[in-house]
Each structure stands twice: as structure tokens, then as C-alpha cells.
């Protein structure tokens, strides 16, 4: 029973990891949150502020 439980937990963990990694890929350059997007905009001198937009918040939009 313990082996079955361990295999089930590993499969669930693997499925969640694969699902999460597909959504977390920053396709337009938006890292994790609006704060990091704004920091990236300032560091790269694209603008003063930035926020994540798009259907899954994967695009970082910078503005002056």
C-alpha cells in the first residue's frame, strides 16, 4: 500500500509540475509579478512602470 501511495503522489506532483511550468513560461517577458515587471522596465530603460497583461499575465507592458 505504501508503494502505491508513493507512486500516486509522485505522479500527481509530476503532473502539477508540468502543468505549472507551461503556464509560468514568460512568453512576452513577464516575470512572476508586476513588481518584477516594473523593475525590469526600469533596469532596461523601457519605461518607469510596468505591469503584466494578457490572458495568463505573461506579457510585460512598460509605460512612461
UniProtKB/Swiss-Prot annotation:
It is found in: Secreted. Disulfide bonds join 30-52, 37-60, 41-62. Expressed by the venom gland. The keyword Secreted applies. One of its GO terms (molecular function) is potassium channel regulator activity. GO terms for cellular component: extracellular region. Keywords: Disulfide bond, Ion channel impairing toxin, Neurotoxin, Potassium channel impairing toxin, Secreted, Signal, Toxin, Voltage-gated potassium channel impairing toxin. The keyword Signal applies. Residues 1-21 form the signal peptide. Transmembrane segments: none annotated. Its main location: secreted. Belongs to the short scorpion toxin superfamily. Potassium channel inhibitor family. Alpha-KTx 11 subfamily. This recombinant toxin inhibits mammalian voltage-gated potassium channels Kv1.3/KCNA3 (IC(50)=0.79 nM) and Kv1.2/KCNA2 (IC(50)=26.4 nM). Has the structural arrangement of an alpha-helix connected to antiparallel beta-sheets by disulfide bonds (CS-alpha/beta). This is Potassium channel toxin alpha-KTx J123. It comes from Olivierus martensii.
Amino acid at each position: 500500500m505504501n508503494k502505491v501511495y508513493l507512486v500516486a503522489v509522485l505522479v500527481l506532483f509530476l503532473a502539477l509540475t508540468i502543468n505549472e511550468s507551461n503556464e509560468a513560461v514568460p512568453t512576452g517577458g513577464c516575470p512572476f509579478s508586476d513588481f518584477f515587471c516594473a523593475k525590469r522596465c526600469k533596469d532596461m530603460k523601457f519605461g518607469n512602470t510596468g505591469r503584466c497583461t494578457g490572458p495568463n499575465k505573461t506579457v510585460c507592458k512598460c509605460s512612461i
